[in-house]
Every structure is written in C-alpha cells, then in structure tokens.
Design a protein with these regions (language model features):
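Structural and coupling elements of P-loop NTPases
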Residues: 1-329
Length: 329
C-alpha cells in the first residue's frame, strides 16, 4: 500500500499518471469543504466517495465509513412528543411505497422505519390514520434483488410490509399511543398535465396505475370537477417516468394533454360557511388530492395572489406532511 500523494513510490510506479492524479485531488480539495463528522451527524454535510462498483474500487472504503461514521437511531418528532429509540413500546412510520417490485405478483411494499421498541412477526399495532388495529406479519428485508423474511426488527431497522392499500406514506403505527411522526414533506406541484389512455378501453387500467403510482409519491393525482385525471409534478422528468412505468408495469400507453394551470395550493378553511362560499365562487378551480384535501388550481401567479387577497381567512398552503388530512374549520 502506498500512503500519501507525495510518496516517491507513486512517481516510480506511475510516472505518466501521477501528475493528473495530484491535480485532480487538488481540484477536489479546492472545490469542497473538509469533512467534519459533527456537521455530518447534524445533517449539514454529506461525504462524497469516488469509486466504481463494477471494478470493485472504493467499495470497501464506503462500507468502512458506514461502520465508523453512521449514527445510531435518533429521537424522532412524533407531534405530541419526541420518541426515543430506547423506548420499549413499538413505534414506526411508513416513508416509502413501491409498487410492482415483483412484476409477476403485482405486489406493493410499504417500507417502514422502526423508531422504537421491537417488531415481532404477527404483532398487533394501531394504525393511527385509520384509527384501527392491524396485524403486522410477513415482514421482509431487502438486499439488492433478494428478499429475506424478518421475524424481528429493532429501532433503526427498515422492513417491508405487503401493502394492499391500507398503508400510505406518512402513516404512523404504534402499540396504541396517539402519535404522528413528521418530516416527510409534500410540495405543491408546479407542473400539470391531463392524462388519458391512447386506447380508451384501457381507461380503468390507467386509473388503477395512476392511483398506485400516486400512493408511491411518484406523481400527484388530483380529482377535478370535470372528472379528468390531472397530474401534478415538481419536475418534468416525473411525467416521463410515470409514462414509462404505466407502459411497462400496467401495459397502458398514456398520453398527456396540456393544462391551463400554473400552480396549486392546499386549502384550509376556518369554518364550514367559508368553505361553502369558496366552493361556490371557485368551483371550476378546485380539485382534491389522494388524501381528500381540497386543492386550489391557479392559472397564473397573479390569479393566486388575487384569490388569496380576496379570501384572507382561507389558508393557501404550499407544503404539507405526507398523509396529513388538513383540518377544515
């Protein structure tokens, strides 16, 4: 092993390449900040590793850094209080949903992070959003394409739960305590397209596919007064990815039509009377999201600003938590 860029052995063994190596390292050092472990643990800094998996170069260094630097499970904000990872009672939240991980079985997996306590296969937990008990069983852990059944999991572990529609991103599961883990933001979309199937006979497949992809968070699916499927995104690439997945996973060739919408905001009303007046006045500019929250669709920034000024008591919200049902009055 050769240690240090100034080691003369480098010049002996690699006389043609050593100059470029030193220049490259100097450039990287000049363009970045020195690594500080405290900043990394505080979420203020991310280390960058250079390597190649196919050449097995740098892989060992990444693994060693994970072992050395990765922090233990941290306390998490659950709304009513902070949940400590050392607590005995089980708590966890769903942070990701992935459909069709096994295309042969059309399965959907909800990825759940255990925040405290211990998961045991077959245990009964409280689903806070649905306000009912459910049984957790047949959990999985993943390594590349391999799945392994998990009988137990502890704070900091991530397990996959077979999902038949009862779990959504942001859902909190506990052994009975009323909590709600936070920190999974949902941003108001800035780009919009109407979706339709090239083959009208596949309209139901399109609807089902978009519902499942919407549950993942791959795209936002909004229900409009006209019944047309409206998709909202924060980047153009989302539309391309969704079209590709609809074709490969649901055998639906989707087409996009332009929408006269520039931005959107979730709505929060102070009382039922205000809500009804707003709905009468803005009927054709309203939609609802996957969680049933009302959404205002603005055809311009100016239109949004004027509407906000005309309705000062109504909350126009640009960011909300995943799975959050906004209180209305």
């Amino acid at each position: 092993m050769i240690e240090g860029l100034d080691n003369p052995r480098l010049d002996e063994l690699y006389p043609m390449e050593v100059g470029e190596l030193r220049d490259g390292v100097e450039l990287i050092r000049g363009a970045s900040h020195p690594f500080e472990l405290d900043s990394f643990l505080a979420g203020m800094q991310t280390p960058v590793f250079f390597g190649s998996g196919i050449n097995n170069f740098g892989v060992q260094e990444i693994l060693e850094a994970l072992v050395q630097w990765a922090p233990p499970p941290q306390p998490r904000d659950a709304g009513a209080r902070m949940v400590q990872p050392t607590e005995k009672a089980f708590t966890g939240f769903v942070f990701k949903i992935q459909a069709n991980m096994d295309p042969k079985h059309r399965d959907r997996i909800a990825f759940l992070r255990v925040c405290s306590g211990m998961y045991e296969s077959g245990m009964k937990v409280r689903h806070l959003r649905l306000n009912r008990d459910m049984k957790l069983g047949n959990a999985l852990t993943f390594m590349a394409n391999e799945r392994v059944a998990s009988e137990r999991a502890f704070a900091g572990d991530i397990i996959g739960i077979h999902n038949h529609g009862q779990l959504q991103i942001g859902d909190t599961l506990t052994e009975g305590e009323t909590l709600g883990f936070k920190g999974i933001p949902y941003f108001a979309p800035e780009l919009f397209r109407y979706a339709r199937a090239r083959d009208p006979m596949k309209a139901k497949q399109l609807q089902k596919g978009l519902e499942q992809l919407g549950e993942e968070g791959a795209i936002q699916v909004l229900q409009t007064p006209t019944g047309r499927l409206l998709l909202g995104a924060v980047g153009v690439l989302q539309f391309e990815i969704v079209a590709h997945r609809l074709q490969t996973e649901y055998q639906v060739d989707a087409l996009y039509d332009p929408a006269d919408i520039q931005t959107a905001r979730w709505l929060a009303f102070p009382d039922d009377a205000t809500r009804k007046r707003f709905e009468r006045d803005q009927q054709m500019r309203l939609a609802s999201d996957v969680d049933g929250n009302p959404v205002y669709l603005a055809n311009s920034r100016y239109n949004l600003q004027v509407t906000m000024e005309d309705w000062p008591d109504v909350g126009f919200i640009a960011t909300r938590e995943h799975g959050q049902r906004l209180e209305q009055g």
